[in-house]
């Protein structure tokens, strides 16, 4: 339920407090389409390489985020990498990939120049260390989303 906040002596609503459920549809576009199809159909993580600065971007995008050059060279990345940082999520919120508590991490996949966010599994939070090697665990049934990778586990 929404509640309008009316200032004293005025009739102008300056803010509204409440919760809105917003439904939307996001179009993948050319780069995301191939990225998610490759994960779904081939268990492959694809990046895109910049011809000017050489950066390998993940997820793929039409322009390099470092030098703003158009990019179109696809490269297959490893499904292994190094854990750069992480946090333990304790509070529930809409759209979570799993029930809390869980470990949310930023991973630098081998061959990529951009961090890949995902969850960690098969490990307790007390045992997680930055720099540790991790590997993707693929979902049995893949649908063309980030959840095609169930989680990353220690190598």
Where are these regions (language model features)?
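Glycine-rich active-site loops that engage anionic ligands at enzyme catalytic sites
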Residues: 84-121, 125
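A broadly conserved sequence feature marking short terminus-proximal activation segments
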Residues: 2-45, 154-155
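Short coil-to-beta-strand transition motifs
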Residues: 73-82, 128-132
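Short, cysteine/histidine-rich loop/knuckle motifs that typically chelate Zn2+
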Residues: 49-52, 63-69
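Cys/His-rich microdomains that often coordinate metals
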Residues: 56-57, 70-71
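Well-ordered alpha/beta subsegment
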Residues: 17, 116-155
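Residues immediately within or flanking Cys/His clusters that coordinate Zn2+
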Residues: 44-47, 61
């Amino acid at each position: 339920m929404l509640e309008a906040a009316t200032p004293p002596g005025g009739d102008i609503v300056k803010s509204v407090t409440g919760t809105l459920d917003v439904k939307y549809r996001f179009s993948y576009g050319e780069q995301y389409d191939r990225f998610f199809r490759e994960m779904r159909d081939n268990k492959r993580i694809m990046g895109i390489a910049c011809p000017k600065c050489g950066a390998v971007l993940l997820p793929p995008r039409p322009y390099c985020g470092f030098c703003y050059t158009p990019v179109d060279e696809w490269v297959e990345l490893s499904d292994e990498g190094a854990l750069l940082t992480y946090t333990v999520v304790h509070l529930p919120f809409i759209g979570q990939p799993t029930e809390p508590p869980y470990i949310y991490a930023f991973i630098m996949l081998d061959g990529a120049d951009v961090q890949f966010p995902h969850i960690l599994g098969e490990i307790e939070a007390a045992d997680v260390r930055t720099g540790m090697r991790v590997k993707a665990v693929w979902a049995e049934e893949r649908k063309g989303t980030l959840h095609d990778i169930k989680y990353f586990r220690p190598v």
